[in-house]
């Protein structure tokens, strides 16, 4: 089990990116959170096995959302936490 902090750059706020990310996570069984940050990026904590997390990151790089445009993703490993689901936070 791994837990990643993911910062997503690009046109990712005000375009439904967090809800698209939640749908991807729910479909894959990934737990964690997603929220907008004041600098225009989106912050994600995603927890699951290594293979699923790799697939999750690939999926959010090219979201099935015509309004979102991801230009960069920074990923770092953080300590494992307890999540009940994947949720959009504010």
Swiss-Prot record:
Positions of disulphide bridges: none
Gene3D superfamilies listed in its UniProt record: 3.30.70.100
InterPro entries membership: Acylphosphatase (IPR020456), Acylphosphatase-like_dom (IPR001792), Acylphosphatase-like_dom_sf (IPR036046), Acylphosphatase_CS (IPR017968)
Pfam family, one: Acylphosphatase
Catalytic activities: an acyl phosphate + H2O = a carboxylate + phosphate + H(+)
Keywords from the UniProt entry: Hydrolase
Active site location: 18, 36
GO molecular function: acylphosphatase activity
Database matches in PROSITE patterns: ACYLPHOSPHATASE_1 (PS00150), ACYLPHOSPHATASE_3 (PS51160)
EC number: 3.6.1.7
Group of enzyme by EC: hydrolase
Domain Acylphosphatase-like residues, every copy: 3-90
Similarity comment: family membership: Belongs to the acylphosphatase family.
Record-linked PANTHER family: ACYLPHOSPHATASE
Protein name: Acylphosphatase
Provenance organism: Ligilactobacillus salivarius (strain UCC118) (Lactobacillus salivarius)
């Amino acid at each position: 089990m791994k837990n990643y902090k993911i910062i997503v750059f690009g046109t990712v706020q005000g375009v439904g990116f967090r809800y698209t990310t939640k749908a991807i996570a729910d479909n894959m069984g990934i737990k964690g959170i997603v929220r907008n940050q004041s600098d225009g990026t989106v912050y994600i904590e995603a927890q699951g096995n290594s293979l699923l997390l790799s697939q999750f990151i690939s999926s959010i790089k090219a979201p099935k959302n015509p309004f979102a445009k991801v230009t960069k993703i920074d990923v770092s490993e953080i300590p494992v936490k307890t999540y009940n689901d994947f949720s959009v936070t504010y």
